[in-house]
Amino acid sequence: MNTFVLRLVYVHSQVRWYTVHFTGSERTEYADFLARMGMETDPKHQRDLNDVKAAIQTIGNKYGAHLRYFRDEQDIAHRGKAMAVPSTLVMRSQLRLYCHVLSTKVVILFNGNFKTKGPISAQDCLRVEPHFTKANQLTRIIDQALEDGEHLHWDNTRTVLVYDQNKPINP
């Protein structure tokens, strides 16, 4: 996995949303997700994408990033904390956008795809597994970077991530 920096995506009244930008990549992870999902021609898939974007806005402006608003697909066995936006409380969709909820005020958006229908886990779905695995790896790296405090740390209020965009985080 390449080094990366965080990029601020949205600042809402309740939540700051960040994403990952890998060194050498043209797009951030979230921008790649939006571009790929935006190319879907199925009207239901377009509705699902719009619903995910609306959920981010609603969570960000109205509720805060409480865990009940995220789909718990955490892979505890592999020590990752990736979750998906949004939970079944907000919408029932096969679209998964993986993220790392650091607090009720800070979320890092990753990437995702449409999960295969049926009782199949994210770990076993060929479409979302690569995104889910990468998201879990990133949660561990980000948690470690926060713990180390060298390239990434909280501000005094624990509502803003402080980092230098010229100093990538090393996996």
State where each predicted segment sits:
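Basic, Lys/Arg-enriched alpha-helical interface segments
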Residues: 1-93, 116-171
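Active-site beta-strand-loop-beta-strand hairpin of nuclease catalytic cores
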Residues: 100-109
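Short acidic loop-to-beta-strand element that houses the catalytic metal-binding Asp/Glu
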Residues: 94-99
